[in-house]
């Protein structure tokens, strides 16, 4: 069996694909797996690190601007798109793909369109409640549309294609043990705060986190704080933290990217993060109480919708970016850590939301689509 996964841009598209690929490899150890991504995306780091082969396409999404620069960019993107579809057809043929699985990101569209043109079985996983542009564009080509939330089904034209599977997360998010992970990371008995605002980072949130670390120093470092800065902030944030009188020490840990996220999240007592669907589901699988600060810079405000859905079930505290100060976050951290009853209720609510067998469900569907070619 030869399986192609196509994804890219951010960890939220890539990590679910890796989770499913790992389960597929466990079920079918003789399978060959190939990823198709975009030039310059996080997939260039994450996919090889996970042990899978990657081929990339010229990147770049469409601009929504009607300016000359926006139109010029879109002309280039459309040219690259046609070229990428043809390149994907060649990759699929040369690899002898039996199925193509997309989990979002620029590269998914040409790869899934190519699969459709070649009559190769394919499925698409949409992580958000409201489908994104790529998902809507590839629906006609895909055999199955896999969604996280039952209420999302109404957005799809062909209901016979839609199946609810939840969000695939790596098994480590489910099975890691807190104390073992804390020991592995060399952490002491103080509470652990994990903050991360996406694989690329977020300027306003990194600035807020730097100030939060200053408040933590002022308070005598009552907890340990691990922060994933992101690639865009790595050049300037460590310097900003130093200017506030804080340095990496036994309580402050700055990382450009947290590659061992399942371990770090399992060790954490509280997670502070954006509210992308992938992140929300990883937090739910790990059962770690969280403070969600949804990004206001996303299509259809989908992150706030994700965050509010968790908040309504008692599974998250939500602070909108416009109201997000370091002091507000510090106060919320203290509130969660001091009220153990509320903390435990949030932990339990998160575990109720999680779909721990989501990756298994996707593999079941992949086996159905390739019936006759797979062997259990």
What are these regions (language model features)?
Residues 2-10, 30-83, 231-233, 322:
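Conserved nucleotide-sugar phosphate-binding/catalytic loop shared by glycosyltransferases and other
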Residues 42, 53, 116-178:
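Active-site-proximal region of nucleotide-activated glycan assembly enzymes
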Residues 52, 120-121, 269-270, 287-295, ...:
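Structural loop-to-beta junction motif characteristic of Rossmann-like glycosyltransferase folds
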Residues 87-100, 108-123, 136-140:
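Glycosyltransferases and closely related glycan-assembly transferases
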Residues 97-99, 262, 266-280, 288-289:
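Acidic donor-binding loop of glycosyltransferase active sites
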Residues 342-356:
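A short, well-ordered alpha-helix in the C-terminal region of glycosyltransferases
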């Amino acid at each position: 069996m030869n399986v192609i996964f196509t994804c890219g841009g951010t960890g939220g598209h890539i990590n679910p694909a890796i989770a499913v690929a790992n389960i597929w490899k466990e079920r079918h150890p003789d399978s060959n797996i190939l990823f198709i991504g975009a030039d310059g995306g996080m997939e260039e780091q994450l996919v090889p690190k996970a042990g899978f082969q990657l081929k990339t396409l010229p990147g770049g999404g469409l601009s929504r601007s009607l300016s000359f620069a926006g139109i010029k960019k879109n002309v280039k993107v459309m040219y690259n798109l046609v070229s990428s579809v043809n390149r994907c057809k060649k990759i699929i043929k040369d690899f002898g793909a039996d199925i193509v699985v997309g989990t979002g990101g620029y590269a998914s569209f040409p790869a899934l369109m190519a699969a459709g043109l070649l009559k190769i079985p394919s499925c698409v996983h949409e992580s958000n409640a409201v489908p994104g542009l790529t998902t809507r564009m590839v629906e006609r080509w895909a055999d199955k549309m896999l969604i996280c939330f039952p209420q999302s089904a109404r957005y799809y034209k062909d209901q016979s294609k839609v199946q609810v599977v939840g969000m695939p997360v790596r098994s480590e998010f489910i099975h890691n043990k807190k104390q073992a992970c804390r020991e592995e990371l060399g952490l002491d008995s103080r509470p652990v705060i994990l903050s991360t605002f996406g694989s690329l980072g977020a300027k306003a949130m990194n600035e807020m986190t730097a100030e939060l670390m200053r408040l933590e120093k002022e308070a005598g470092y009552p907890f340990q704080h691990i922060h994933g800065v992101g690639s865009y902030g790595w050049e300037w944030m460590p310097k900003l933290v130093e200017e506030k009188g804080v340095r990496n020490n036994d309580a402050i840990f700055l990382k450009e990217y947290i590659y061992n996220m399942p371990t770090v999240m399992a060790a954490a007592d509280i997670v502070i993060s954006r509210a992308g669907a992938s992140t929300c589901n990883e937090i739910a699988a790990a059962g770690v109480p969280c403070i969600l600060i949804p990004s206001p810079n996303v299509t259809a405000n989908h992150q706030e919708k994700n965050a509010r859905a968790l908040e309504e079930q008692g599974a998250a505290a939500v602070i909108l970016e416009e109201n997000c100060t370091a002091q507000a976050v510090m106060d919320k951290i203290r509130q969660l850590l001091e009220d153990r009853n509320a903390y435990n209720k949030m932990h339990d609510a998160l575990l109720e939301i999680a779909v721990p067998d989501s990756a298994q469900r996707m593999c079941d569907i992949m086996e159905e689509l390739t019936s006759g070619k797979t062997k259990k």
